[in-house]
Amino acid sequence: GHNLSTVDYIHRPDIRNAPKRDAAAVVTDGVYRRTGKLNITSVSTESGIVCNIGFDESLMYEAWKNVSLKELPGLPVIKYPEGVAALARHLEEVMRYQTPADYHVFRIQVASETLEETEYPEFINPIGSDGKTYALLKEARTERVVISGQAVDVRVPAGYGISPFLKVSRILEMIFSAYGFTLVENPFATDYQLSKMVVLNNVADTIVTGEIDCRNLMPDCTVNEFLDALFCRTGAKVYVNAGRKAVIRLLKDSIGATAS
């Protein structure tokens, strides 16, 4: 009777208010104490109360389930008061590995049209020659493109077509920081190969206003979808604890680790 009263007699068909789906719960046993979320699956006087309690990772995944990466709170906007030209020069230095940054810059082809045996490719981070080195095409210019089956000249502003690609390590840092977690172990920041991993985008007007809004660089998916994709591709698994500390471990490292 007492247990049923603590869950507002939700087994009764005549209750006025619908019971809460989840409730905070504290599990204690001697000095052991953990806080989680209790979910009641069924209640009856015959079988009692059937429930489950989620801890740590399950609570984290539940909180992030429907959160879009583009809508993460606190996403930075990188502003260059000097304008588009200065921002483009900075990204050019990043492309040449002269300046460390939270992103990489390199050319990718995002589209191509062929008209009368002439190809008209479209690039993010288009490159031209600057004397003996490669340089980003960063000035205002006229480009020839295919529109409705015809080749036409289009005038584009300075910085058009230039867009950095966010490092996966930085995206992970922004995810955990947004929800108050400290990321204490991140192989995407320390492993030589994984530290080069980025998320591509095809946003041609990223820097034309003289700033970089990181929302435009984020993939169009939820946090959970992003983390699941990382696990499928790299075996990276997230572990969190009640102290709001997070660790990312690779499956291969977990399998090969010596038990402590």
Label every PLM stretch briefly.
Residues 1-233, 240-243, 247, 253-257:
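Polar, S/T/G-rich
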